[in-house]
C-alpha cells in the first residue's frame, strides 16, 4: 500500500540548486546499495559509500567510510559522518538475523538514530529503503522492524522519501538467483500450488527512481511503493523467468503447506537459506501495491517481468540458474559415494574378500586391518566434510589425491581392474573430473556456500 504525509507534492530544487549533491549511501556494498551508488555516480553526484568493512580495492571517485549499524545506535554517533552531506540514503537491510546482526538493531535502532542525526545536521534529504509490507498489517519481525524506522522518520521535520520496494530482481541479487534457480528445475514444487501474489520490480527501475528523487526537496515525508507494473502469482513469475532463459514452460506441482512449513523449518538451520518460517509467511501474505506514485516520480511505467532478462544475456542466466541446483546435487552425490564406500568397507561387503584384495597389494594381518578400517573411516569423513564444510578447496584437493593414490596402487598391483566389467578403476576418472569441476566452480563463481 502507498501512504503519504500531509503534503503529497514534491517540489524540485530551485534552478540554481539543481546541481550534483554529496550523497551518503549506507549499505553501499549490498545488492541495492551497489546499484544505487553506480546510478548516482552516472548522474554526476559525489558519493560517499558507507560500508561495514572497507574494501581491499576501491573506486577512485568514491569516498569509502566505515559505518557499523550495530554500533551507531545514538544520534551523536552519526553527526561526524554527516558533515558536508546533502542527501542520506539508507540501503542497509538483512532478510535473516545472523552473527549478532538483528532486525531490531539494523532496521530500527540504528536508522532511528541516523534519522535524528540527519535532522540535527539539517541534511537536505533522506531516502529510506524500506520494504513493501512495512505497514499497519505487518506481522513479521522483518516488516515490523522496517516499519518502526519508517515511523520515526515520519515524525521528524526533515524532507524524506520512504521507498517500499517489492521483490527486487537484479543480476547479482540473492532473490533473483533463487527464483531463476527454482525456475530452471525440471519440476518445481510450489507451496499451495504457487498462488501467492508477487509484484517484482527490476533493480534498474528502483535505481532510476532514486536518481529522480535525489535532486528533489519534498515538504515532509512521502512514502512510495516500488513494484512492478502488475501482480503475478508465484507460478506465473517463475514460468516467465524460465521462458526468458530459454527453458520452455514451467512444470510444477503443488506442495502441501505442511511440507512447505517443514522445509522452511529445515531452512532455518541453514545459514544461507532464504527459506525460513518467517520468509514463508511473508510469501503467503501476497504483498502487492498501487504504483501510481512510482509512475509519477519515475515518469514512466516500470519494467514488466517478461522483460527482466535481456535475450542477449539469457545463456548466462540459464547457466548460473542450472548450476544453482546442479552444483549442490553433484556435491551431495559425491558425499554419498564417499559415505557408502566407507560403510561398505566397514562390513557391508564381506570382510574376508576385502582382506583378500588387500593381500593382492601386499597388505596382510595388522597392516591390512589398519588399511581397511582406516580407509573406511577416511571415506566417511570425506563424505561428511563434503556436506558440512563451507570452505572445501583443500578437501577437494585431498579427495583427488586419495583417488589418484588408490588408482595408482591398484593399477600397479591389480592392473586387471582396468578391464573389469564393473570398471572399478575407470569410474575414478569421472569422479576426479567432477571433484575438479566443483573446485573450479566454487573458486570462480562463489558457489561454495551451502
Description of each model-found segment:
Residues 348-366:
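Membrane-interface interhelical connector segments
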Residues 26, 50, 91-92, 126-131, ...:
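SDR active-site strand-loop-helix element
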Residues 22-43:
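N-terminal Rossmann NAD(P)H-binding glycine-rich loop of SDR-like oxidoreductase domains
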